[in-house]
Amino acid sequence: MRCPSCFHNGTRVLDSRPVDEGRSIRRRRECESCLSRFTTFERVEESPLIVVKKEGTREEFNKEKILRGLIKACEKRPVSLRQLEEVTQSVERELRNLGISEVKSDMIGEIVMEELRDIDDVAYVRFASVYRQFKDLNVFIEELKDILQKERE
C-alpha cells in the first residue's frame, strides 16, 4: 500500500478490524519511511445488480429507493428506522444470493412485502396498495381477508 504522505510503497498494518457487519475490513497502517499513519478499508467488489422495470427499462439496484418506500408505508407506525434498514439489507442480500445479474422489479416488490408482513400488517397493506395498485375497495378487502386468514393459521 502506498503512503498518502510520502508515496513510499512500504507500509505495515498496525490494526485490522471487521466493520460494516463483516463486509469490510478497516486497517490502520504506518509508513515504513515517514512513519505517517493512515486508515484503509478493504471490501469485496460486488457486481452491479440491474433492476428490470415493468416497462422494460433497466437501472442499477438502489436500496435507498426501497428504504424510502418502507419509510412511507410505516409512517405513524411503531416501526423503527433500524428495522427498516434491516429489511432493506435483507432484501438486497436475498437478491444477491440468487446469483443473477438482472432481477425484475416485481420480484423485489414481492420480497419487500413478505419482509414487511412479518413486521407490521398496516404497513404491509399500505405498501401493497401502492405496489399492487389496488383499483378499488374490493381488492383492498380481499388483501385484508388474506392477512386475517394467515394470522389464524
From Swiss-Prot:
One GO term (biological process): negative regulation of DNA-templated transcription
The keyword Transcription is assigned to this record: yes
Zinc fingers (unnamed), renumbered ranges: 3-34
Cofactor(s) the protein needs: Zn(2+)
Domain of life (superkingdom): Bacteria
Keyword DNA-binding: yes
Keyword entries, A-Z: ATP-binding, DNA-binding, Metal-binding, Nucleotide-binding, Repressor, Transcription, Transcription regulation, Zinc, Zinc-finger
InterPro entries (alphabetical): ATP-cone_dom, NrdR-like_N, RNR_NrdR-like
Cofactor, how bound (note): Binds 1 zinc ion.
Boundaries of every ATP-cone domain copy: 49-139
GO molecular function, one term: zinc ion binding
Family: Belongs to the NrdR family.
Its job: Negatively regulates transcription of bacterial ribonucleotide reductase nrd genes and operons by binding to NrdR-boxes.
Protein name according to UniProt: Transcriptional repressor NrdR
Gene behind this protein: nrdR
